[in-house]
Every structure is written in C-alpha cells, then in structure tokens.
Amino acid sequence: MGLVKGNCGCYWGIKGHWSRNCSPVCEIANKNYYSRRGIAPRRTFWSVSNKSLVHLDANSLMIDYENVFYYTTDITSNKAIIESSERIRQDHGNPSVLINNAGVANGKTILEESEDERRRVFNVDILAHFSLVREFLPDMIKHNHGHIVTVASTASFLARPQLVSYSCCKTALIAFHEGLSQELRMRHNARKVRTT
C-alpha cells in the first residue's frame, strides 16, 4: 500500500485532482495476487476502518489470521464476481479503493495457445476488471469518493513472443483506465473518484 500512496499524490497533482479532504489511504482496497502455481488470480480487499482483509481466490485458502477473510471466487465468471461482491458488501461494506492487478499468461505462441487458454487470459486480465468496476464504482460515484487503480505492464508497450494475448490485454487496460477516467469526470461528475 505504501507504493500506492506514493504514486497517488504524484498522479493526482499531474491530473489537477488535489483535494484536502480525500486521503490516498485505502479504506477498503481490492488487490490482486496469484496462487503459488501462478494460475489462480486472487483479489484482496483491505479495510482500514474495520481492519479487515478479504481475499477473493479461485482456490480455497485455509490460512487462519485475525480479521482476514477468504472468498473462493472464479474471477473468470461474471456471475461468481457478482455473487462474491454481494457477500463482501454484506460482510464488509463497499470498498472505496479498487486495485485491479490481476494477470495470467500462458507463455505460448499464438499457434500453440488453445482458444480456451486465450479466453482465460482475456477473462482474467481485462474482463474481470470491467466486472469489478461495475460492482463497486456506483457506490464510489454516489459518495463522490474512491479510487480505482489499474495496473498494466510494460507488455502494454512491447509485445514479446509467447505473450501476445497477455500483451493485448495489458494494452486494453490502458484504454480502460483512460476511458474510465474520462467517464468519471465528464459523464458522472465524480471528480473525487480517483484513477491511477
């Protein structure tokens, strides 16, 4: 979270979004991690206000920590995202910070990669971001408070062999971020919902 806090101030200044009443400290944040095998993306919500940490992961995790909660969720499924989002809102409230950092890659050439493998990359690396934003952005707009962080990759600018589908998704994330930023400002008049 320290990296996010450091980058937020820099970005807000560049975009002219300085605000004294909005701290970049995350009240409830969504982050993404990977399982040990690197194939199961995990989403994590962190709450400063009630000190809860909520993980969404395709695998069932059984690590017992105080104030840490796990939700088994297949983020390639929009239905599963909606169901988990509803449970999170019931149990922890709406997140005010969403950090989209999910990413998987197959490491195969275009000809080697199966259609199912390619669709999985797109479902995790870009489409899950749309689904999560649709779930949590309305409350941020309503309160004109929140932050959505979209993490792309250098692969957005340099497509490498055996990472073409991954690079396509990461490039799409840049357009996603830029379009979302403009919609918040020009269509929703939610200038205090930040994007990084």
Curated annotation (Swiss-Prot):
Keyword Iron set for record: no
Enzyme Commission number, as recorded: 1.1.1.1
Pathway of action: Mycotoxin biosynthesis
Effect of gene knockout: Significantly reduces the production of T-toxin and decreases the virulence to maize.
One Pfam family here: adh_short
Molecular functions per Gene Ontology: alcohol dehydrogenase (NAD+) activity
UniProt family annotation: Belongs to the short-chain dehydrogenases/reductases (SDR) family.
Role noted for this protein: Dehydrogenase; part of the Tox1B locus, one of the 2 loci that mediate the biosynthesis of T-toxin, a family of linear polyketides 37 to 45 carbons in length, of which the major component is 41 carbons, and which leads to high virulence to maize. One of the PKSs (PKS1 or PKS2) could synthesize a precursor, used subsequently by the other PKS as starter unit, to add additional carbons.
Protein name: Dehydrogenase RED3
Organism this protein belongs to: Cochliobolus heterostrophus (strain C4 / ATCC 48331 / race T)
Lineage: Eukaryota, Fungi, Dikarya, Ascomycota, Pezizomycotina
